[in-house]
């Protein structure tokens, strides 16, 4: 999915609001995903999956930090996330559908915290961006 100049501006704009909340939004995203899609928990058997756990906060922060990094390098998402793509495809072997589920949960978290900023246009741009990230993360599965 190609991101237009307007999409890129919308994504960068919403991520300025997200940047200071990586741990909080990341943890909320993971908790929402684990609750809504319980099979996603199978990749985290060693984690304390209870609300507010340090492991959920820590991993959530990593997830959102990677999204922030991708937004900061929006013209080279593939290069920016290349190592993560390798990790998820070859070592962790995460089912590719989980990236879409994570993206949906992240959109909900952004909507909860920034309802006025998540206009229909920004929502569409952020969705396209998250799809692009998912495509990059699953590219090495082939």
UniProtKB/Swiss-Prot annotation:
It comes from the Eukaryota. GO terms for molecular function: heme binding; iron ion binding; oxygen binding; oxygen carrier activity. The keyword Iron applies. Keywords: Heme, Iron, Metal-binding, Oxygen transport, Transport. O2 binds at residue 59. GO terms for cellular component: extracellular space; haptoglobin-hemoglobin complex; hemoglobin complex. Heme b binds at residue 88. SUPFAM superfamilies: Globin-like (SSF46458). Red blood cells. Residues 2-142 form the Globin domain. The keyword Iron applies. One of its GO terms (biological process) is cellular oxidant detoxification. This alpha chain is from the adult major tetrameric component, which has been called hemoglobin A or AII. PANTHER family: HEMOGLOBIN FAMILY MEMBER, HEMOGLOBIN SUBUNIT ALPHA. Involved in oxygen transport from the lung to the various peripheral tissues. Heterotetramer of two alpha chains and two beta chains. Belongs to the globin family. This is Hemoglobin subunit alpha-A.
């Amino acid at each position: 999915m190609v991101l237009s100049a307007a999409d890129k501006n919308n994504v960068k704009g919403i991520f300025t609001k997200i940047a200071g909340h990586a741990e909080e939004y990341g943890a909320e995203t993971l908790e929402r995903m684990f609750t809504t899609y319980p099979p996603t928990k199978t990749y985290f058997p060693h984690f304390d999956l209870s609300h507010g756990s340090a492991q959920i906060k820590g991993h959530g922060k990593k997830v959102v930090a990677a999204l922030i990094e991708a937004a900061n390098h929006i013209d080279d998402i593939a290069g920016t996330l290349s190592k993560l793509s390798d990790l998820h495809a070859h070592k962790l072997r995460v089912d590719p559908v989980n990236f879409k589920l994570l993206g949906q949960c992240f959109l909900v978290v952004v909507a909860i915290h920034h309802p006025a900023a998540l206009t229909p246009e920004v929502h569409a741009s952020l969705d396209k961006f998250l799809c692009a990230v998912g495509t990059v993360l699953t590219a090495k599965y082939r």
